């Protein structure tokens, strides 16, 4: 889809890139890291995502890379995301949801991708997001449960 508006991630004055990391309450919720990561794939600019609190929560990024996202998994806790700036779309694919957090990120990626994606093990997403298909459909998403 063609986009007229977008969003930019701005580097710091010294040229270093923005880093987003999770922390205990009242800090940034670790449950939102995967959503921020997939959203950053379409931004203008780069961001370092740092998952400090949990091991291996970023291991779903290989699925996003398969879809065309520019992500470098630095280690089990950090991923560098280079945004597309809506210049290229993610590509549809078949994938499996490993858990709730990764599943919702993959669902967001699938909704923004060109083509039809299929997410296996979607029950993982249901555990954290009640009636997600119906709620997204009400917002205008082209989504169905098969």
Question: What is the predicted function of each stretch?
Answer:
Residues 1-146:
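Short, structured segments at the rim of ligand-binding sites
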């Amino acid at each position: 889809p063609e986009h007229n508006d977008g969003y930019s991630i701005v580097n710091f004055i010294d040229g270093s890139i923005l880093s987003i990391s999770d922390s205990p309450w009242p800090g940034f919720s670790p449950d939102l890291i995967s959503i921020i990561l997939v959203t950053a794939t379409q931004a203008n600019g780069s961001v370092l995502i740092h998952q400090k609190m949990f091991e291996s929560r970023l291991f779903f990024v290989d699925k996003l890379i398969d879809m065309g996202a520019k992500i470098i998994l630095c280690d089990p806790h950090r991923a560098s995301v280079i945004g597309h700036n809506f210049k290229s779309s993610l590509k549809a694919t078949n994938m499996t949801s490993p858990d709730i957090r990764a599943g919702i990120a993959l669902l967001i990626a699938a909704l923004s991708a060109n083509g039809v994606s299929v997410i296996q093990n979607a029950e993982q997403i249901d555990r954290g997001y009640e009636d997600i298909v119906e709620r997204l459909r009400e917002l205008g998403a082209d989504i169905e449960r098969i």
